[in-house]
Amino acid sequence: MTSSVWQERRHGEDKQRRNDHRSPYQRDRARILHSAAFRRLQAKTQVLGVGMNDFYRTRLTHSLEVSQIGTGIAAQLRRKYPQHKQLLCSMSLLESLCLAHDIGHPPFGHGGEVALNYMMRDHGGFEGNGQTFRILSKLEPYTLDFGMNLCRRTMLGILKYPAPHSKLFVAGKHSEITNHRQLKPSQWPPVKGIFDDDNDIFAWVLEPLSEADRSRFTSTQQGSHPALHHYPHLRTQFKSFDCSIMELADDIAYAVHDLEDAIVMGIVTASQWHQDVAPTLTNSGDAWIRQELADIGNKLFSHEHHLRKDAIGTLVNGFVTAIVISEDDVFEEPLLRFNATLEPEFAIALNVLKQLVYKYVIRKPEIQMLEYKGQQIVMGLFEAFASDPERLLPLNTQERWRESEQQGLNSHRVLADYISGMTDEFAGRLYQQLFSPKAGSNVELSKEM
């Protein structure tokens, strides 16, 4: 049984609302769902914000799908493992994690993330998951100083990479650039961890753990990255039980639903599927994969909409029902001792789908050009604001910047907070206002700032 200490909030609350019988995790879910940071996801594209097609997913619709898959995983595990029903005590908790998992991602996806990481290279770096942790615990104005003031277990679940930047960062041999246009993302991969500026919250989240559990949970190892030949930084090794479900749901949504977008838009073809995916499925060591998925490409690439949707449903169902609970008995705390994992053959199949999306969608020159453009916009905005914060920042952000300066804190983090919260469209228009001679009045922009 998990301890009640995991339901505690950093800032104690004594709100007594009339006839409010919601659980702590139902309250967490409501706070996330009604937050401005969550709403902004509707204007941040997931992968395919290309052209005039309105079919593609945004980060908001992606997060809703991750939530649906996450609760589906939990329901399956409750049936398979009745002995673990205490671990799976709240669907609202898992919904909260899935809905919130992308809240910290900046405008223009990976391009914006790399740009902010480069501009913050001497000030603690930038990474989307670290920013999510920061928004939930400090920035979103549900409370004055404690962000959404979520339960400790919710904050533990959002920690995909439970170690601070300083413990993971390895100084690399970067090529010096004289112009922002020369920046190569492969040379500036973000450190996957939380920011040192948020170590106080990190320590509070891990407070209930034994010293041994805390030490092992935050331990690191030499990193690797599927998109990079050499990832220079260290990586974390562990995540909580709730986080493992959220991450699997995210992976399934990314691999299956982003693939669906790409098929509909003609970016991934049947011949590419048969070349890159079909052989792995046909030769799988799992009988269900061989029988059900080997020929699924015919449905996926059918012009009959209902056949394609049926195939997508089959893929999602296959992965969700192949998830098991594994145990690592080195941990004492049940939330760390147990993790949700995919059966090995299904993990191979999911990875093949993810690689297909990466190869033909993410690396597509048109997508990379959009990322590059976003990269330039974000770096240009950061450079401008850093040059004269008290002149160019909105008044409320100026105040945060001044407070940070006066307290001897990392004032550059305030700039990263402001820019990372922008939508793609707002960042683009603000860039035009600052740098284009033909841009119009600032009145409309000022209303949004």
Curated annotation (Swiss-Prot):
Composition bias type Basic and acidic residues, residue spans: 7-27
InterPro entries with a match to the protein in the record: dGTPase, dGTPase-like, dNTPase_2, HD/PDEase_dom, HD_domain, PHydrolase_assoc_dom
Domain HD: 59-255
Region of interest: Disordered: 1-27
Record keywords, A-Z: Hydrolase
Molecular-function GO terms, alphabetical: dGTPase activity
GO terms for biological process, alphabetical: dGTP catabolic process
Family under the similarity heading: Belongs to the dGTPase family. Type 2 subfamily.
Protein name, entry field: Deoxyguanosinetriphosphate triphosphohydrolase-like protein
